[in-house]
C-alpha cells in the first residue's frame, strides 16, 4: 500500500456523494480506497427544515480523529459550505470523513471530491 504520487496520476475521477446526516456523529461519509488519494473539494450542508441545526465533521487518519468543523450552525432552510475549493484537503488511503447533526433527517450533506490513482 503506497500513497499515490499525485504528480504522475494516471486517472482522476470526479465523484459526488449525498447523505442525510443523523444524530450519530460517527457516521462514515467518505472512505479513501487503498492506493488512492481523494481531494476533497466541497462539503455542503443544506438544512431542509424550519429549525436551525448544528453539524460536526471529523477526519480519521490512522485511527485518530481530528475535527474539521465542530457544531457549525446551519440556519433553517439554508445552505452552509463547510469546505470549498479554497480550503480543500486530501484524504490518503483508508482515511475517512465522518459527520453528524444535532437533529436527524434535518441536514442533507453533499461531498464532492476527486479520486486520484497513479496505477
Regions found by a protein language model. Give the residues of each.
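C-terminal interaction-tip segments
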Residues: 1-37, 100-119
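Asparagine-centered strand-capping/turn motif at beta-strand->loop junctions
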Residues: 31-32, 44-52, 101
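A short beta-strand element within beta-rich, extracytoplasmic domains
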Residues: 38-47, 95-99
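Short beta-strand/loop motifs in extracellular/secreted proteins, especially
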Residues: 41, 51-56, 105-109
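Short, surface-exposed beta-strand/strand-loop-strand elements in extracellular ectodomains
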Residues: 50-71
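Short proline/glycine- and polar residue-rich coil/turn motifs
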Residues: 72-80
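Exposed aromatic-hydrophobic patches
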Residues: 80-87
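Noncatalytic modules at the cell exterior or secretory-pathway interfaces
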Residues: 88-103
